[in-house]
Amino acid sequence: MTKIEIKKIVEDLIDTFLEAGKISLELRSKGLKKEIKSDNTPVSNGDLEVNKIITNKIKKITPKIPIISEETPDNKSDNDLKNFWLIDPIDGTYDYINNLEEFTINAGLIIDRKPVAGLIYAPAKKRMF
């Protein structure tokens, strides 16, 4: 994968991250449904909805690259992947569910076991990295 191809992929994801951030804030303003996962950490319907938005877009633009996501437990079985996406749809769920600003939406692209690109969006602060 060339640098130009990687740049295009990241550019294609920016609007999706902005949309996911908007939806995360809308869901939070309406009141989140919260649960505790088997690892004793919180998860909300916001986490799951953002995960769905991000993974659906990534599957469309890079269908041959597997996705490993915190909120999709059945996709962590292959420990020998060279190329994959690593996603944390809401990093900082505790802050997210408690109406604090310190949470982000994250995705990183790993090629040949090396990080080559990533996006981090802080919706409450409207900051993209």
Roles of regions detected by a PLM:
Residues M1-I90:
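N-terminal subdomain of lithium-sensitive/metallo-dependent phosphomonoesterases centered on the IMPase/IPPase/PAP
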Residues N79-F129:
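DPxDG-like acidic metal-binding loop motif
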